[in-house]
Regions:
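Extracellular glycan-recognition regions
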Residues: 1-179
Length: 179
């Protein structure tokens, strides 16, 4: 999905256009009478990686609108993917959030984090994945561990989303991928 991207040194800035997200809602009714809209239109800049890896990146953004996030995502295809987000929640907090999609998406708020900057990490060993967050880029804490039915080569990269708002800049710094 198209967007504006700027790269300078170890900094990548991606503009998240308005009403962009990766989320596959189910057709079930919920108590509130509405469900998240299914969208797979957020800008996703990725590379393909074979086998085990660890991706780390420092992320930040302005936290203007609900569900704004700077994220990292792994993807087999549009029905099988997962994202690790630093997001403005519907509770008004900044949090480490994860979504795993195997047909339908789930959504799990993790820890609330202070400030507008965090580190995100995704680790792969075989078909097992772990998402971690950090405030200092040194001490990482697990937010989610899961299994995905993926092939040896998957897409791994940066995702910028603004599901409910007008969009904005997402900043990614010190990106590293270890194999």
């Amino acid at each position: 999905n198209e967007s504006e991207i700027m790269m300078e040194g170890d900094k990548i800035e991606i503009f998240a256009p308005a009403k962009t997200d990766f989320f596959c809602g189910s057709t079930d009714q919920c108590e509130e009478g509405f469900l998240p809209e299914s969208l797979c239109n957020a800008p996703y800049y990725y590379t393909e990686i074979e086998g085990d890896f660890v991706l780390k990146v420092k992320v930040s953004h302005g936290f203007k609108d609900t569900y704004d996030s700077a994220s990292v995502m792994i993807m087999k295809d549009l029905n099988c993917w997962a994202k690790c987000c630093f997001e403005l929640t519907d509770f008004g907090t900044h949090a480490a959030v994860s979504v795993v999609t195997k047909g339908d998406s789930d959504d799990a708020n993790g820890c609330n984090l202070e400030g507008n900057t965090a580190w995100l990490q995704v680790c792969r060993v075989g078909n097992n994945f772990a998402f971690h967050y950090s405030l200092d880029g040194v001490n990482f804490y697990m937010m989610r561990y899961f299994h995905m039915p993926v092939m040896p080569v998957i897409k791994v990269g940066l995702l910028a989303q603004a599901p409910t708002g007008t969009g904005g800049k997402r900043v990614y710094e010190n990106l590293s991928i270890e194999r």
